[in-house]
């Protein structure tokens, strides 16, 4: 009897040790990642919950909810679910200062707690693109792209004409966020004026496949060009002619000058900006007219030779010159085609003649052989006598 009492307490302790872990309450959490300004859900999963006190605290150890009752007056935190299986809270408009570990505490005979780590990412805003100095044709342009806030550090890329450009990037950490910059250099010409260069920023805070872009329109300065267009190709006495000086340049020339060689313009002429109007033309108006334009990068000059014909004169318009060129090209093509056809016919005739010659030669040899076979060697002798 005494021996039985001796083993009673050890058996009870062994049963408690085996049964305790299997019947105890537990709490589990999961880490959460959210973009700045987004919505995060923090969940505490309960196992074998028996109605004990559940407390949720923020990273500063301030109590947010006590058994489903709000304890901190921050309306961004809302209790979404409180059940024997889980406690779920919702955080809207997430901020960097909300980042950290959120405590899920279960108060029983032994306090249990787990930490859910909230990570807040910062998506980049549209990059800021600037040019270091004014671009001029024949030189280089340097562009810079800046993203002042991002987390993690944004990756910057340059694109031009759907091709990626190689830039040089640098970053600086400011507290929890990064400031990232990138520069790119390339040569430019006047044809690049108005072209588009894109700076693109990406990081994990943006949805997959999304990016923030800024388009920069190139401003390339270059010297002017000038060309005169006439309102008609052939002018006669009494006609009105309008000459237009088509000017390009960056910056665009703001003044155009009209001249007529070493002579002054006719008194009837009206020069207004890019146009020169010559009404009531006479032969005395003949001459070389010029328009000139300039900017800080150079100047341009265009010429137009005016010939005024009599009213009854028969002349060919200047626009007929392109047709003459086209006609000459067509004539040359026809000549080449004829040459090719003649060559093909000549080769065909020559090949056929060679075939007939060989065929006739073969017939002679066969006839001679047949005659020799029939007459024995007489044929050979007769040939000798014939030749003698």
Swiss-Prot record:
Keywords: Cell adhesion, Disulfide bond, Glycoprotein, Immunoglobulin domain, Membrane, Phosphoprotein, Repeat, Signal, Transmembrane, Transmembrane helix, Tumor suppressor. GO terms for cellular component: cell leading edge; cell-cell contact zone; membrane. Residues 21-119 form the Ig-like V-type domain. SMART domains: 4.1m (SM00294), IG (SM00409), IGc2 (SM00408). Expressed in the brain and several organs including the kidney and liver. The modification Phosphoserine is found at residue 361. Involved in the cell-cell adhesion. Has calcium- and magnesium-independent cell-cell adhesion activity. May have tumor-suppressor activity. This is Cell adhesion molecule 4. It comes from Mus musculus (Mouse).
């Amino acid at each position: 009897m005494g021996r039985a009492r001796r083993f009673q307490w050890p058996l009870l302790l062994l049963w408690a040790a085996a049964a305790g872990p299997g019947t105890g309450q537990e709490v589990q959490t999961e880490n959460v990642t959210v973009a700045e300004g987004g919505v995060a859900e923090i969940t505490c999963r309960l196992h074998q919950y028996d109605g004990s006190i559940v407390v949720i605290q923020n990273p500063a150890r301030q109590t947010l909810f006590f058994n489903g009752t709000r304890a901190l007056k921050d309306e961004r935190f809302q209790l979404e679910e409180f059940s024997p299986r889980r406690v779920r809270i919702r955080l809207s408009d997430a901020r960097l200062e909300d980042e950290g570990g959120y405590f899920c505490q279960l108060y029983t005979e032994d306090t249990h707690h787990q930490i859910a780590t909230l990570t807040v990412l910062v998506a980049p805003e549209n990059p800021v693109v600037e040019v270091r100095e004014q671009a001029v044709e024949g030189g280089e342009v340097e562009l810079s792209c800046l993203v002042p806030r991002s987390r993690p550090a944004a990756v910057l890329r340059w694109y031009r004409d759907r091709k990626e450009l190689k830039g040089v990037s640098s970053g600086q950490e400011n507290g929890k966020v990064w400031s990232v910059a990138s520069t790119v250099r390339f040569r430019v010409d006047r044809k690049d004026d108005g072209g588009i260069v894109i700076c693109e920023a990406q990081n994990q805070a943006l949805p997959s496949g999304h990016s923030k872009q800024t388009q920069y329109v190139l401003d390339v300065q270059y010297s002017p060009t000038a060309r005169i267009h006439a309102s008609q190709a052939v002018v006669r006495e009494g006609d009105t002619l309008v000459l237009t000086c088509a000017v390009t340049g960056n910056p665009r020339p703001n003044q155009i000058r009209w001249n007529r060689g070493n002579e002054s313009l006719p008194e009837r002429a009206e020069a207004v900006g890019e146009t020169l109007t010559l009404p009531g033309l006479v032969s005395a108006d003949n001459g070389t007219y010029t328009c000139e334009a300039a900017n800080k990068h150079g100047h341009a000059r265009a010429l137009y030779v005016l010939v005024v014909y009599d009213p009854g004169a028969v002349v060919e318009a200047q626009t007929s010159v392109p047709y003459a060129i086209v006609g000459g090209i067509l004539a040359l093509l026809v000549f080449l085609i004829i040459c090719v056809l003649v060559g093909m016919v000549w080769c065909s005739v020559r090949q056929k003649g060679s075939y007939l010659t060989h065929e006739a030669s073969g017939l002679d040899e066969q006839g001679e052989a047949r005659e020799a076979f029939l007459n024995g060697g007489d044929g050979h002798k007769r040939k000798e006598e014939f030749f003698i």
